[in-house]
């Protein structure tokens, strides 16, 4: 069975945590919109599905995954569905729920990242809200990044007698998502994250260990990994990254 992932073909965005899980597990999947050469046609392919009233469990927005006749939307729910199939979560119910809790926190964090460059409205261009973005980013860097990273670091400390991972004794999809967070912060806020990393050694250890996994390393060095750019969740703007 080949999974079909629907997400915007030009960004990592919220769909990247799903791609990382599929790549790590070496699953057969089709990144559907990326197989369409024309960007406008790729967007149309997704929007036509979203506008289709055909009785399926209709997603509100991408990412969504199709597995046979099953349609699942929202990155955290997609991962909750996939993880047992891909051996990316424990078979213990309490650990599965905790992993899902962590992933929902990741979702919250990604929204806060997005709001640094779109603090007023998604319908406005970044250039239309630069001054508000500067204000939002100052608070995000000084308060929100440390708060989230401390949370992840604390989870890792609490689990240190069992493993170096976030949940239980094995790598889970939450660790892959934490990797994506650090990669994104290094791209979008390199000066800020450089000052913070030494305070969260276990978080950085997770990032480093995942980077060295052959399947992940191969993915990162392939054309399947979309580069960070100015259209995704993590965006680099010099005026938001002042020393």
Where are these regions (language model features)?
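Positions that flank functional sites
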Residues: 36-37, 171, 225
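GST-like domain detector, emphasizing the conserved glutathione-binding G-site
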Residues: 1-136, 237-240
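GST-like fold's C-terminal all-alpha helical module
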Residues: 94, 101-212
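Conserved alpha-helical elements of sugar-nucleotide-dependent glycosyltransferases
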Residues: 13-17, 202, 215
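Short, contiguous strand/loop micro-motifs
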Residues: 4-6, 193-194, 218
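C-terminal helix/juxtamembrane-tail motif
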Residues: 2, 216-243
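Short amphipathic alpha-helices and their capping/turn residues within compact interaction modules
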Residues: 26-27, 83, 87, 150, ...
């Amino acid at each position: 069975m080949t999974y079909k992932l629907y997400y915007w073909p030009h960004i990592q965005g919220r769909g990247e945590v799903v791609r990382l899980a599929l790549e790590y597990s070496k699953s057969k999947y089709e990144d559907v919109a990326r197989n369409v050469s024309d960007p406008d046609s790729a967007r149309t392919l997704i929007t036509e599905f979203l506008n289709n009233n055909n009785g399926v469990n209709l997603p509100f927005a991408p990412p969504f995954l199709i597995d046979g006749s099953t349609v699942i939307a929202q990155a955290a729910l997609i991962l909750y569905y996939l993880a047992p199939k891909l051996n990316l979560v424990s078979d213990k119910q309490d650990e599965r729920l905790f992993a899902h809790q962590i992933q929902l926190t990741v979702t919250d964090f990604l929204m806060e990242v997005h709001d640094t460059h779109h603090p007023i409205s998604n319908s406005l261009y970044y250039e239309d809200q630069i001054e508000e973005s500067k204000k939002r980013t100052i608070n995000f860097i000084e308060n929100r990044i440390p708060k989230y990273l401390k949370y992840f670091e604390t989870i890792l400390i609490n689990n240190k007698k069992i493993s170096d991972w976030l949940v239980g004794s094995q790598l889970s999809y939450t660790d892959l998502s934490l990797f994506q967070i650090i990669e994104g912060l290094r791209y979008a806020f390199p000066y800020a994250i450089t000052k913070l990393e030494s305070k969260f050694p276990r978080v950085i250890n997770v990032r480093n260990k995942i980077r060295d996994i052959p399947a992940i390393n191969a993915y990162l060095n392939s054309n399947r990994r979309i580069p960070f750019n100015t259209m995704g969740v993590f965006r680099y703007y010099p005026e938001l990254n002042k020393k």
